[in-house]
């Protein structure tokens, strides 16, 4: 709403048909949706605004963690670090492949020169409200903003 649209919640499986029939005019997703979800058959412009990143995390209950030996904790931490690095490599390759396929076989144009500051300004009120509603979010957002 803050960006001038009318958000519509729907299952991912309904997005293609909704785009096809004009129920929705666009979708928010990563580049792979253009190819795996076939959205590039309908959506011919993709704006790369980097408003979201894939923050995959590994979680474990504190109760379980405390019952694991320090040696095994280190093994788990190292495996998590290694899998994170491998995931980054695989994800980057998947994105590159999706972009190439979307451009060459679907005719999708990629717009990379996006006015990100305009998006930040338009959503600043929403972000402020969210920070008030959920204590601690401001600190997390500051950490996210500090990452380049």
Map each language-model feature to its residues.
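N-terminal secretory/targeting leader peptides
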Residues: 1-148
């Amino acid at each position: 709403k803050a960006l001038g649209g009318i958000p519509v919640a729907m299952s991912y499986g309904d997005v293609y048909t909704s785009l096809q029939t004009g129920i929705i005019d666009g979708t928010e997703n990563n580049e792979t949706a253009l190819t795996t979800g076939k959205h590039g058959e309908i959506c011919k412009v993709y704006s790369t605004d980097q408003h979201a990143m894939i923050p995959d995390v590994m979680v474990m209950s504190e109760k379980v963690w405390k019952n694991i030996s320090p040696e095994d904790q280190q093994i788990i931490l190292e495996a998590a670090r290694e899998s994170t690095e491998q995931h980054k490599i695989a994800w980057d390759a998947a994105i590159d492949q999706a972009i190439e396929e979307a451009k060459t076989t679907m005719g999708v144009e990629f717009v990379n020169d996006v006015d990100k500051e305009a998006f930040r300004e338009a959503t600043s009120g929403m972000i402020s409200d969210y920070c008030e509603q959920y204590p601690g979010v401001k600190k997390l957002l500051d950490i996210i903003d500090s990452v380049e």
